[in-house]
Design a protein with these regions (language model features):
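Transmembrane helix-loop boundary segments of multi-pass membrane transporters
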Residues: 54-64, 136-147, 166-177, 287-288, ...
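Membrane-interface loop-to-helix entry segments
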Residues: 146-198, 203-204, 232, 254-260, ...
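Hydrophobic transmembrane alpha-helices that form the core helical bundles
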Residues: 49-57, 66-67, 76-155, 159-163, ...
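The first (N-terminal) embedded transmembrane alpha-helix
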Residues: 31-50, 364-368, 444
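Terminal cytosolic tails of multi-pass membrane transporters
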Residues: 1-29, 408-437, 456-505
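Helix-loop-helix junctions that connect adjacent transmembrane segments
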Residues: 64-65, 139-146, 175-304
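Helix-loop junctions at the membrane interface of multi-pass solute transporters
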Residues: 22-26, 53-54, 84, 96, ...
Length: 505
């Protein structure tokens, strides 16, 4: 616990040195850019749109009117608890480092892999969803082969941009934040002025479900996946903390505000979209209920415009997610936590980016949908493709939130044992509210983890349980005793400065 307790008023680089790491990545992101990367990954124009049908079919308009604010309320507790830890332990390893310092290398290793699985599944879900939107817009037949090719091109564009530097990506993330706000404004204003509207009570009283074998309240809870998956990836502000100026303050605000502002804009958009529903049965049966609402209310031309707006938002979202995932891979490999760690921890001297980690993130993300398509082809009678996209998003949600929850639970244990004190906190902290906020956050994470593996999400549960068994077996058979958690890159500050000078040559 000594590392988190010694940061004081030191500069960003001095703090990083005290954790034993050199300033290898270019620290050029401002506070807004740090916020923008998490805001872009949350991307209300991605998660809320691609899973709109899931929420609508599960519980109807009430899922939008009551479900979204319910999830937002509890996710704000999670974000605040994570922000506090980011301020205390400001390294790119983020969740993995927090868990390691608080619980030891075993907890850190498990957290790292859960976070990596969640992030890779998130990239796959985002970019494959984007490919499904973009393919018909390009006039191509909507076949799995075409989806996969377009998906690969999207991933390639994200990898190239992340390879060539954080400055380019930061500017695009800044643009993405304003683009999302403008996109929501266009959607809301168009519906407010030109589309027919249901009464406001429709959002809170109109129930609907296609889950006939379960009681309505159970179906409603299942519909929360729409909002909960949208609120993933905001740990990106922590993963890019070594590239952020005034990191111990800017990154925590980036985590918290990305959730709060997304919650406001997301609710505004979902409310107006849902109030524009004409025929609930026809809308729920549509291939894309979100776009169907626009086509019915404003015509096919505007529906196509909205489709382009959403598709570009997904592209921005995928770009930011590759950035976050590559930083997580870099930090974990830097501590020798992955196979071929030396390769994945490589930093490009020219661009000062974790280039190898960028391409690994893209490759793993491309592999996942290809694996799913292969399974569908092999077992067409047992696997329904329509259930696989929610399964991927469910895996992403559970993996990420378990990786969020482990360090928060370990922190509560450390506080109870007297190991973590106020002295360990960074400048952004919750004071006396820290314990209750962390308790609520952990309870919520436990609740959604159980919820999203119950029927009709048993496919998610099966895949995730199998993955967890493999991870634990691999740890106890191959890793235990060898992996020691965060590793100092050098013994002295002079050696760290020499590492930094090597990159400047």
């Amino acid at each position: 616990m000594s590392e988190p307790e010694c940061v004081g008023r030191a500069s960003d680089k001095e703090v990083l040195h005290r954790f034993g790491y050199a300033q290898q990545l270019l620290r050029d992101m401002g506070g807004f850019s740090n916020f923008a990367i998490s805001f872009s990954i949350i991307s209300i124009l991605t998660g809320a749109v691609t899973l709109y049908g899931v929420g609508l079919n599960a519980g109807g308009p009430v899922v939008m009117g009551a479900g979204w604010p319910l999830v937002t309320f509890f996710v704000l507790f999670v974000a605040a608890a994570m922000a506090e830890l980011a301020s205390a332990i400001p390294t790119s390893g983020a969740l993995y480092h927090w868990a390691s310092f608080l619980g030891g290398p075993a907890w850190g290793w498990l957290t790292a892999w859960l976070n990596l699985i969640g992030l890779v599944a998130a990239i796959a879900g985002i970019d494959y969803g984007c490919a499904q939107f973009l393919t018909p817009l390009l006039g191509l037949p909507e076949t799995p082969a075409n989806f996969t090719v377009v998906f690969g091109v999207l991933l390639l564009s994200h990898a190239v941009l992340n390879h060539i530097g954080i400055r380019t990506v930061a500017r695009l993330n800044d643009l993405s934040a304003w683009y999302h706000a403008a996109g929501v404004a266009i959607v809301v204003l168009a519906l407010a002025f030109f589309a027919p509207k249901q009464p406001v009570a429709y959002l809170f009283t109109k129930t609907f479900t296609t889950v006939t074998e379960k009681p309505y309240w159970f179906a409603f809870l299942g519909g929360l996946l729409q909002a909960q998956w949208t609120y993933t990836g905001y740990d990106a502000s922590a993963h890019t903390i070594e590239e952020t100026k005034n990191a111990r303050v800017s990154a925590p605000w980036g985590i918290y505000l990305s959730v709060a502002i997304s919650g406001f804009f997301g609710y505004l958009m979902l409310a107006f979209v849902t109030l524009a529903v004409k025929d609930l049965g026809a809308t729920s049966a549509a291939a894309n209920p979100f776009i169907y609402i626009f086509e019915q209310g404003l015509g096919s031309t505007f529906g196509r415009v909205v489709l382009w707006i959403v598709t570009l938002a997904m592209w921005f979202c995928g770009l930011s997610c590759v950035t976050s995932t590559s930083r997580m891979i870099f930090a974990f490999a830097r501590d020798r936590g992955m196979p071929l760690s030396a390769r994945w921890a490589h930093v490009s001297k020219r661009w000062r980016t974790p280039a190898a980690a960028v391409w690994l993130a893209a490759a793993l993300s491309f592999f996942l949908p290809c694996l799913i398509l292969g399974l569908v082809a092999l077992f067409p009678r047992r696997l329904d493709f329509s259930r696989l996209y929610p399964a991927v998003t469910g895996i992403s949600t559970i993996g990420l939130y378990l990786s969020y929850g482990i360090p928060l639970l370990l922190k509560l244990r450390a506080i109870r044992r007297g190991v973590w004190t106020e002295r360990a906190n960074g400048p952004w902290n919750l004071g006396n509210w820290s314990v209750p906020v962390n308790v609520v956050a952990v309870i919520w994470i436990a609740f959604i983890t159980v919820l999203f593996v119950l029927p009709p999400n048993e496919l998610t549960g099966s895949v995730f349980a199998g993955t967890l068994v493999v991870l634990l077996a691999f740890y106890f058979l191959c890793v235990r005793g060898r992996f020691r958690g965060p590793v100092r890159q050098a013994k002295s500050q002079e050696d760290l400065l020499m590492l930094e000078q090597e990159l400047d040559k």
